[in-house]
Amino acid sequence: VVSRLPAGQLAGQRIVLGFAGTRLPAAVERMIRAGEIAGVVFFADNLPSRSAGRRLIRRLQAPPRPPGLRDPLLAMTDQEGGLVKRIDGAPTVSARTMGARGAAFSADQGRRAAADLRRVGINVDLAPVLDVARPGGTIADANRGFGSTAAEVAASAVPFAAALQGGGVATTGKHFPGLGSARLNTDDAVQRIDLSKSTLREVDEAPYRRFVEAGGDVVMLSTAVYPALSPQPAAFSSQIATGELRERLGFKGVSITDALDTVAVRSFGGPAKVATAAARAGTDLLLYTDPTEAAKAQRALLHALRTSTISRASSEESVQRVLSLRHDLSQSG
C-alpha cells in the first residue's frame, strides 16, 4: 500500500493533531478525507463527558478515506491516572500509587482503563510514563512515575501496558530516553538532561527495554536535549530516535514525538524546520495540538519529499509501521 500512496498522503500519515472543543473542525475533516492525517489526540476539553467524547470520535471516524487508508484513525489521549487523565474512570490512582501497589494491581488498572477508553472510542493511550523519577523532578513531583529505580518502573508499568493491550488499546512508553530528572515541563522550557551516557543507558532507558521486549506498541520521544547522546533534542536526533531506540533497544513499533507546537520547541525553529528534522531523524509520527501547525507540518513534509530532503524509502518505512498499527487496532476489541 505505502508504495502507491501519493506524496501528500505519505506526508500526512506521519501527522497526529489536536483541536479545541467537541466539534470536528471542517479543516480537520478535509485532511481526513484527503488522507493527510494518521490520527487525533484528545484533551479534556474534547471529552467533557464519555457520551460527548463518543459522539466526537464517531464523527472523526465517519468520513470516507482514500484507498489503503480506510482503517480507523489513531484516536489518542493521555490516560495515565492521577493528575494526567482525560476521561473519568481508570486508572483511579496515580502511576506512583500503582508502582507502590505492584504488578497485579497495575494490571487490573490497565484492564479497567482499556475498557473505559474503548467505550469512548480511544484506541491509543499515551501511557505509561516509563521515566525513572528522581527527587525534585517534575515526574516525581506530579506522581507520574511508577518508581525511582528502573526495576520499580518496569515491574508495574509493563504489566499495566500489557493489560491495556489485552483490552484492545495500544500503549505508549514515554518520554524516551527519559525525563525522570527534568526539573521543568518540556512544553514550557528547553530541558537539558545532563546525565552520563552510561546512566542514560543503564538506568533511564532500562524500563524502555523491558517495554520493547514485552511488545509495547508506541514510544514517545522527548523534546529535551541529552548532550551525552546528541546535541539535538531526542525527537530530532537520529542518534536517539534511530540509534538508541531502534538499533540499540530493537524497537520495531511506532515512534512519536512529544508535542511540537510548544514554546520550548519553537526555540529550535519554525514548524517546517522542526517537522523536517523530526522526520529525518526517523521519528514516525509528529504530534501537534494545533491543527493549523499540523497542516504546516504536513506541507513541509510534502515539500521535503518532493525535494528529496527526506527520502521516499524512509518515509514508507515509517508509514508502514503507522498503517500496521492502525490495522492491528481495527482487528482488536
Question: Which ranges hold each PLM region?
Answer:
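N-terminal hydrophobic targeting/anchoring segments and the immediately downstream early-domain regions
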Residues: 1-86
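Second-shell residues forming the walls of enzyme active-site clefts
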Residues: 6, 27, 48-67, 151-310
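Hydrophobic faces of well-ordered beta-strands that scaffold small-molecule active sites
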Residues: 12-19, 38-42, 71-79, 124-128, ...
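Glycine-rich, aromatic-flanked loop segments that form ligand/cofactor-binding clefts
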Residues: 61-91, 106-132, 153-177
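A charged helix-plus-loop insertion that forms the helical arch/lid used to bind
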Residues: 91-103, 146-147
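Short glycine/serine-rich loop/turn segments
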Residues: 93, 124-146, 171-194
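Mid-to-C-terminal alpha-helical segments outside catalytic/metal-binding sites
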Residues: 303, 308-333
